[in-house]
Amino acid sequence: MAKQAIKRAKILAVKNNNKIGVLLINLGTPDEPSVPAVRRYLRQFLSDPKVIDVPSLMRWIIVHLCILPFRPKRSAKLYQKIWMPEGSPLLVYSEMLRERVGETLGDDFCVALGMRYGKPSIETALKKLQEAQCRQLIVLPLFPQYSTSTTASALEEVRAKNSFKEMTVIDRFFEEPHYIDSMTTLIHENLNEFQPDYFLFSYHGLPERHLVKSGCQLAICNRKNNCSPISSSNENCYRAQCFETSRLIAKKLNLTDQQYGVAFQSRLGRAKWIEPYTDKYLIELSKKGIKKLMVVCPSFPVDCLETLEEIGIRAQSQWQRLGGETLKLIPSLNAHPQWVNAIAKMAKKSLQLF
């Protein structure tokens, strides 16, 4: 009862000219699918010490001498395959999400979108919220599973540009019931037209050293199999969070352990990344005789290059070459009505933290 009274008081304060600002953060996207635009984006993205976490001189050499002379041309061609008439899918769907969350929350809230890299920047989004005379700030990075290279980097940028005295952060929601329910509903909607032999949950990968820096004890972690359920010993482990999300969704779908698996995509460079790798997992599934595969990407709430091209085109092509019949990619949550409501509920719940 005390918590509910506090919440009512908070909402009453909002109505008395204390508007709440909500900052949704996504990773970012090039302005256009051209080589110069992709080069600008990659330069900013890969120069982040939380992304390529090596000494600054070594990072400069890697980015400017090993990546930027070659990768922008290849990446631009990939972006061209998924670019929408309205622009980048990541930006189009993120803006749609921002707009609908704002409509759902109502006039007492102001919702802005900021990208960690590219436009609109986090700084620009914060200025919009300040101009709207918001008094308090709720920050929600759209990364369900916490990692230093996404969530921590975004929050570091917020703190560097922020002038709000009252701020609360939703830094992860990998096991948030509203998020899990939204994912489950989305999958159920697609099961009406496609019945798979197997479900694959594919997450963005990370270098293993990032897990070590987050406190994950790899020496006692059975990395080849499912991570242990979340506890105080692995609560900051990105890989463990991914497995926990998968377990929760699978439970809602009444899947057995033999009906689904977890893998990690988008690896870059020669360093050891967390396993199993999605492309290699597809090979193993084909050897087991799986023909109809449904792929879900829970770490990407908004469709982007990694979902639409890497899975929707490249993995689809690989699956057919391996003899598979169908690879069905479940679209990201994007601006799904249940997901919009889920974000609104998480934002209102976070008011108790002020």
Curated annotation (Swiss-Prot):
Compartments (UniProt record): Cytoplasm
Residues binding Fe cation, per UniProt: H204, E306
PROSITE patterns, alphabetized: FERROCHELATASE
Enzyme Commission code(s) on record: 4.98.1.1
Catalytic activity: heme b + 2 H(+) = protoporphyrin IX + Fe(2+)
Pathway: Porphyrin-containing compound metabolism; protoheme biosynthesis; protoheme from protoporphyrin-IX: step 1/1
Keyword Metal-binding: yes
Main location, first listed in the record: cytoplasm
HAMAP family: Ferrochelatase
Family of the protein in this entry: Belongs to the ferrochelatase family.
Known function: Catalyzes the ferrous insertion into protoporphyrin IX.
Protein name: Ferrochelatase
Organism per entry: Coxiella burnetii (strain Dugway 5J108-111)
Native organism taxonomy: Bacteria, Pseudomonadati, Pseudomonadota, Gammaproteobacteria, Legionellales
